[in-house]
Amino acid sequence: MNLNLNEKQKQAVEYKKGALLIIAGAGTGKTAVITQRIVHIINSKWAKPDEILALTFTEKAADEMLQRVDESMPIGYGDVWISTFHSFCDRILKQEGYNIGLDSDYILMSAAQSYVFLRKHLFDLSLKKFRPYGNPTRFVSDLLDHFSRLQDEDVSPAEYLEYARALSKKDSVEKEEYEDTLELATVYDEYTKLKMKNSMLDFGDLILLTIKLFREKPNVLKRYQEKFKYILVDEFQDTNYSQSVLVNILSGLDPKKDMDKVGKVNPNLTVVGDDDQAIYKFRGAAISNILQFKQYYPKAKKIVLTENYRSHQKILDSAYGLIKNNNPYRLEVTEKVDKRLIAMESFPFDDDVVNLITAESEDAEGEWIAKEILSLTGNSDETSVKGTQKFNESGQSAFLELVPDRKYKFSDVAILVRANAHADSIVQNLRYFGVPYKLGGSRGLYFRDEIKVLISFLKALTDYTDEVSMYMVLSMQEWGLSTREF
């Protein structure tokens, strides 16, 4: 046992039997809790390593968890199933996919490959309105987004078709809406079958097909239910509905079939998350998963981690004052718990560490940031901060004057943006004022169009049967070829 765990962390680690909801605020050591819980389960002989399933949101988080568990255990205990949802489903489908007619040698398509695949087969689908004559590829991206959202919501092609056909019986539904929905449902069904026929899957298919496997082959499901004595899920607030369904099915509660079991099952299922950190709704994450956990498993124990080891108390108080605007749709309200974070570390900062700056435009904001960095690093004589607005503990703002008196290195400064596109004006100003920077996120080398094409070239050269890569190469404007020519 890690002696550095605080009391709440220790309770979470040592909890033995039944469902467990760990509400872990930012910087409260949730990764340490999950890894120490896995180690404790093994050391206490509650389960063997290969009888534990831990699911995370990203490959980076999975690797970190795997490394921490590996470092805490003797050699030979590295058999815990620690992976992302997609990697777990990929592993299951490679082994069991034949039960639902899936070729185990399927190809997993990236977003770009999915676009090329759908575009290639556009005239093989029953498209009318969504394949306009003047611009047949106009809705390709929209169709893929729509299909992806259906997958995120655990909607099968058969269910979508049933829903679409039922619209014709509703007087309140216009004919055009019915026809559009039926066209989309029909194409969703055809596109899904087309992917299966060509042994091509996308990331949404991994989740949906694993759910399909478990629903249609109860003997396969039972085998994995008996295998995994403990299931742990990290960043539960970031899971989409289908991922939550997958976890619940493995835990003995299928939301589509087993609602009569609500309150009767109490699996060894641990979910860790924080509704206040739910930021991925734009890509399908369903905050309802964590909000409804106690409804599905009313016997679940609830542990709240509030001791923060990462931040200044003023920052925590300001964030708390802001996030309370989401009430009453927060676990703090629905579960009647106190989620206010308490800083456990001291920092060599002034008390006035949280300031709100407003600018007239994106360019003005970018210019202010660049000049402020120059001022902070001692590369500018002008005081760029003339007035700021500061959040107090209640979340209200108060005006103050701020004159930086401390010099930093460029590497001491970080700029966080809500979306990659918001960084453009900032980067332009950093370049203009000569501020060195490194741009993170997913806009690096491998996401540049010319690099994608180059990779497709290399793939086509090494495997002439790779139709997706070949199509991407041939569809380049430089060749002047029509899509009907290949």
Residues of each region from the PLM?
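A basic/glycine-biased coupling hinge at the interface between accessory DNA-binding modules
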Residues: K17-A19, V39-L208, F214, P218-L221, ...
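A short amphipathic helical element positioned immediately N-terminal to and/or at the very start
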Residues: T210-I211, I415
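Conserved motor-region signature of P-loop NTPase helicases/translocases
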Residues: M1-Q67, E177, N219, E226, ...
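Short, function-defining helix-loop hinge/capping sites that tune catalysis or transport
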Residues: I92-K94, T210, S242-Q243, F282
